[in-house]
Structures are given as structure tokens and as C-alpha cells.
Amino acid sequence: FMKRESFKSRLGFILVSAGCAIGIGNVWRFPYVVGENGGGLFVILYLVFLIAMGLPVLTMELAVGRASRKSAVLGYKALEKPGSKWHLHGWAAIFGCYMLMMYYTTVSGWMVTYFYKFLIGEFQAGMDAEAAGAVFSNLLADPLQMSFWMILTVILGFFVCSRGLQNGLEKISKVMMSALLGLIVILAVHSFTLSGAGEGVRFYLIPNMETVREVGIGNVVSAAMNQAFFTLSLGVAAMEIFGSYMGRDNSLAGEGARICALDTFVAIMAGLIIFPACFSYGVEVGAGPKLIFITLPNVFVNMEGGRIWGTLFFLFMTFASFSTIIAVFENIMSFCMDMFGWDRKKAALVNCVIILIASMPCVLGYNVWSDLHLIGGRDVLDSEDFIVSNLLLPGGSLIYLLFCVTKWGWGFDNYLEEANTGKGLKIAKGLKPYFQFVLPVLILFILIQGLI
């Protein structure tokens, strides 16, 4: 029987968990959704939902982890009533982690590729939009180039995790997240010096009631709800595992609030980098891979010192995606160590092989198998993402929630006692009806909306 590892420091726990929550979505989705939904008002609604919906579910995942000191399946088993079947969700959660990694590794590989391309000067100053955009289509058409960067990312990730919790994940996350927070400030300050900065920031953050009316307040509310929910990657035991490693000195709501604050800081700052830059160069702020790999490189090649700013931006993106990858790798390894009694090295090796094979369809989906259309005409990446984002995250969160607030599960009192252990922000007992009756409806709404 091995003694369970734990984080060396509170800061380590917060930065690892924030690193897991902070990913590509903070940069390629949040700013765009803010702009589309009327700026400042959306941000306020987003914060309301983050506190009212994201934070409670975050504390639930952490509570299950901290009370059980176990990974996904055994965590449920330790807390559920004998004979009940909650732990089956643990398997679904781990499946979700594997599935997320099936495409996230490819996208993270793209970030590293672009960091490298800017670093070596492949993007020349003054390239035309055509040429800058062609770099991405050429990358997608080239399975060898894409595989190389994906494989590098996976091997590096498992190498980090094979070194132990404190010497691997925690140490590297501290360095990467500190660098990420530094980089994002430097990049934002630089964006403020551009000619169209004022206009960009105004569009981004000043509440625009005209847009709100056009979009419809109901749609703005539901967009804010979705963004607040998805930003923390809840529902696949990604946070549960860090709960199982954390200390008991601080309350879960307090620690959760810090994770939410860091996540929101990065999301809002990303917009302060992107909007001024796009407005200064007269390009439309889009979302998704197009924004990151076509629009922004286009901006950088026309910018004074663009090679440096492009390199720094993609270093930031590499850290944002890699911090999520090593956090999820830690989870699937911990699951194998718990369930099958493997040591860390074996867990790293076996999972490295599994993830490398499982990541190939996503790489090939853009070239060799580009005619392949799966769920509703989606390509491989979008199909994998649909299963994770529309089904497993909201579905899993709903199960964690019901487990923590119903008498058939762990029960509200047990959850509350665990969450409120330690100093810091406490959850009021009076919130029980809200947790039991309102929250499940909100999450069910997100689940149904995502599936129709």
C-alpha cells in the first residue's frame, strides 16, 4: 500500500488546478463570445453564473476528492452507500479524460508548432494574408508534421508526470503558470500601445445595449451561463483528483474562488490582447482555430517586432494548453495507479502508448481521413469535442451535484462538512434548497441545450 502523494504547497494546488481550468477556450472562445454578446453586460452575467453555478460544482468535485483521497471511481466507492452505482460515473469521467486528450494533444501540438515557426522566423514581416493563412492549411494537410508535434507534446507531458506529483506536475505547473501570468500581462500592455487599442477595448468591455437587443437578452444569458460552466472543465473528475491531493487547512469554496479568479483573469486579459490587436489592423475578431492560427498570425506579421510578439503569444498558448494536458495526464495515471496498483512509471508508459494511438484519428481527420464525417456531419476533432463538451462535462457535473446534495448519494450534510473544513470562505447551510432544486435545473438546461 503506497501512501498517497500530496501537493507540497497550497500555491502548487491552486496553480495546478487553475492550469487545468485555464486552457485554449479562455483565449479562443471567451473574448469572441464577449464581443458577440454586448461586452460588459455579458462579463457581469458570466461572473454571476461562475459564482452561482461553476464554483458550487467545483467545490463538489474537490470535496469528493478530498474526503475520499482517491481517484474518480474509488472516490465514489469510498463515499457512496453500499450497493449503489454512483461509481459507474467514475468510469465515464475517466473515459471523458481520455477522449478530451484524443484531440487536445493535437491542438496543443499546433500551439507548439506556431511557437517554433515564429521563433525561427518562418512568418516573415509583411507576408500577405494569403501566405500567412496558407501556413495553417499546409500544416493540416501534412500528417507527418502534425504527428511530430503531437507526439512531442504527449511524450513531454508523460515525462513530466512520471517524475511524481511534487517534482513533476506541481513543479512544472508553478513555473508555467507564473510565466503564463507574466506573459499575458506583457502581451496586453503591448496591445494597449497599438493605434486601435482604445476602440478595441471599448468594443470588448463597454456594455453595448444595441447588441444585447439584437442578440436577445435570453441568448446573452444562456451564452454567459454556458461560458461560465465550461471554463472550469467540470464533470470529468479533472478537479476531483486535485482535491484528493490537497490539504485540509483551507475551505473548498475559498480555494475554488481563487481558481475561478485566475481563470477569469486569463480569459479577460486574453480579450485585452486580442481586441486591440484586431481593431488596430482592421481584421474581424473571430473564434476558434481560425482566430489563433489565421487571424492573429496575420496581425503579427504586420506588426512592429511581430516575430517577437508572435513568439511570446504562442509560448503563452503553449503553456495554457500544456498545463491542461499534464493535469489530465496526471488524472488518468492516478486512476491506473489506484485501480490496478501500477507504479507511476508504468502508468506513464502504458498511458503514453494509449494516448499516442488514440490521438491519431484527430491528426488524420484533417488529411488522410478528411472525408470522414461523424456526428451530424462533424469532422473527427469536432465529433470528439461534441461528446466531451456537450455530453460528458454537463452530464458528469449533474451527477457530481446530485451525488453531493441528495440523500441517495453522499448527502448534503457530508458534502457541506467537507467543503467547510479549513479556514476561508464557507458555504451557508441555508443554500441547501438552491443546491438541491435550482442548480440541477440550470445544469440540465445546459445539457439539453447542448444536445439539441
What is each PLM-predicted segment?
Residues 3-7, 170, 174-322, 326, ...:
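Membrane-embedded translocation segments of transport machinery
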Residues 4, 108-141, 245-249, 254, ...:
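Helix-loop-helix connectors at the membrane interface of multi-pass transporters/channels
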Residues 89-94, 340-352, 383-443:
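C-terminal membrane-solvent junction of multi-pass transporters and transport-like membrane proteins
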Residues 4-5, 33-37, 67-92, 105-166, ...:
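Inter-helical loop and helix-membrane interface segments of multi-pass membrane transporters/permeases
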